[in-house]
Amino acid sequence: MDIIKAIEQEQLKKDVPDFSIGDYVRVNVKVKEGNRERIQAFEGTVIAKKGSGISETFTVRKISYGVGVERIFPVHSPRVAGIEVIRKGKVRRAKLYYLRERVGKSAKVKTKLE
């Protein structure tokens, strides 16, 4: 089992920023279109984080043209070019799934004042 752990440690990204649930983030994703590759940004609120180590994932939710869109990203994926924390959020829950039923102002997360 030590060989598996060693390979997993080798694959971990070193430059992952410290972000938590409720933060508003911009995730830069590498998208392959035909024979060229470009970077596409996905901005939204982090509503969940799961797992640890190489299998750690987080869910980002945004509203696009009045429709809620959620994407699950592996933190250490080579497809994720970068994660930027735009705004820190102040929440008291580990999972913000209740935001799925909220619309408008009630779906906002308070900003953490540091």
Curated annotation (Swiss-Prot):
Q: Which GO terms describe its molecular function?
A: structural constituent of ribosome
Tell me the keywords, alphabetical order.
Ribonucleoprotein, Ribosomal protein
Query: Could you say which residues form the signal peptide?
Result: none
Q: Where are the membrane-spanning stretches?
A: none
Decide whether keyword Coiled coil is in the record. Answer: no
Q: Name one Pfam family in it.
A: Ribosomal_L19
* GO CC annotation: cytosolic large ribosomal subunit
Task: Write out the GO biological process terms.
Answer: translation
SUPFAM superfamilies xref list: Translation proteins SH3-like domain
- Please name the InterPro entries in this protein's record: Ribosomal_bL19, Ribosomal_bL19_CS, Ribosomal_bL19_sf, Translation_prot_SH3-like_sf
User: Which HAMAP family does the record match to this protein?
Assistant: Ribosomal_bL19
Similarity comment: Belongs to the bacterial ribosomal protein bL19 family.
State what this protein does. This protein is located at the 30S-50S ribosomal subunit interface and may play a role in the structure and function of the aminoacyl-tRNA binding site.
| UniProt-recorded name of the protein | Large ribosomal subunit protein bL19
Give the originating organism: Acetivibrio thermocellus (strain ATCC 27405 / DSM 1237 / JCM 9322 / NBRC 103400 / NCIMB 10682 / NRRL B-4536 / VPI 7372)
Which gene holds the coding sequence for this protein? rplS
